[in-house]
């Protein structure tokens, strides 16, 4: 069954690019047409690239890899945190700190500092060993660290791959990933450079619904990879009891079983070749989201 349907892409406004005056000529091959001054992305190509990225992420996680979810723009923050947490992966959704990958040892020390501050009882001044002023300063430090590093608190080494929403905004993350040869999976809007991304997904990186859908697809790929990893580990442990699953892993297994009939129903929807231009729902999305964000 397909990872996502054409109708889902249309309803989420994935096909809306930027205004024609704001584009990267390298993206020409991914553009279907132009409508009312806005480029329309070829969703047939998007479907193929989604499948390719999905299989890569799934295989990476199945072999023990980790996916770092990155998206600091307002439209992506909630989806990045929600979907990465759902599958137990690290994320950055507020600010990318320079050297987060290339200087990971220093970042790891800051994470350890954050965990040490979390052990302090800020409500009990007497037993804390600090004055009220010191506790206030330490609390501020903790709040700042949690905002910047809270999403990667359990990241013990550089990730195996990175999922990025808006490659232009997250150019620092792209640069660091390239230096370390970390594969990048990302949404490519019509103003992006496809040469910067290893596994591109042509689509709208500004509309909230588009970002939510594509980020969920990547999280689903992670979930399948985790299930495959666990199945492989269980199968290789002959004669021994299977290691208990974490609570969130059990939920993934249960949801994958219960959602299968729904997914099959969605898969039955016939793709519409020219719907990227003619669908009324898509045109409404253009008015409400694309024009405001582009």
UniProtKB/Swiss-Prot annotation:
Protein name: Small ribosomal subunit protein uS2
Protein family: Belongs to the universal ribosomal protein uS2 family.
Ribonucleoprotein found in the keyword field: yes
GO molecular function, a single term: structural constituent of ribosome
Biased composition (Low complexity): 259-282
Key words of the record: Ribonucleoprotein, Ribosomal protein
Stretch list, region Disordered: 254-294
GO BP term, example: translation
Biased composition annotated in UniProt, kind: Basic and acidic residues: 283-294
Pfam family, one: Ribosomal_S2
HAMAP family for the chain: Ribosomal_uS2_B (MF_00291_B)
Cellular component terms (Gene Ontology): cytosolic small ribosomal subunit
InterPro entries: Ribosomal_uS2 (IPR001865), Ribosomal_uS2_bac/mit/plastid (IPR005706), Ribosomal_uS2_CS (IPR018130), Ribosomal_uS2_flav_dom_sf (IPR023591)
